[in-house]
């Protein structure tokens, strides 16, 4: 039986409940939904990267990347990405940011992806992203 390893990096905010930012079991790594919070600073409440979709999207992608790396993975190991937006009006901008980010990252093959509008994010947050990676 392969051991399950919870991943919560020091750079991330402490989860508000009993969950981790990612879990790896064998060659499978699930990154929990990440939002655009800036890296954790002791004594500071979780702080969004900024009020704009651009700021939050880029920080959210970096937060997903850091969990992938903590689990020994990278973007090319990702099989599925799920994006949750709070406003249908953000689709075009998010797609442009997403495409530019992955072009800059040198992604070889695009993973499957799904974007959903979800209004249940905490106030001020515009985007959440999770990812499923298979290593090897």
Task: Give names to the regions the model predicted.
Residues 1-62, 66-80, 85-136:
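N-terminal presequence-like segments and the immediate start of the first folded domain
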């Amino acid at each position: 039986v392969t051991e399950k390893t919870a991943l919560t990096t020091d750079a991330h905010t402490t989860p508000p409940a009993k969950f981790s930012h990612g879990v790896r079991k064998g060659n499978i790594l699930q990154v929990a939904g990440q939002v655009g919070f800036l890296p954790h600073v002791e004594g500071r409440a979780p702080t969004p990267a900024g009020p704009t979709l651009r700021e939050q999207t880029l920080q959210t992608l970096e937060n997903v990347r850091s969990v992938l790396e903590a689990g020994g993975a990278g973007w090319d190991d990702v099989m599925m990405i799920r994006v949750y937006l709070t406003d249908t009006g953000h689709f075009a901008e998010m797609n442009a940011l997403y495409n530019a980010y992955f072009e800059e990252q040198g992604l070889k093959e695009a993973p499957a992806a799904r974007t959903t509008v979800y209004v249940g994010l905490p106030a001020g947050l515009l985007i959440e992203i999770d990812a499923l990676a298979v290593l090897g």
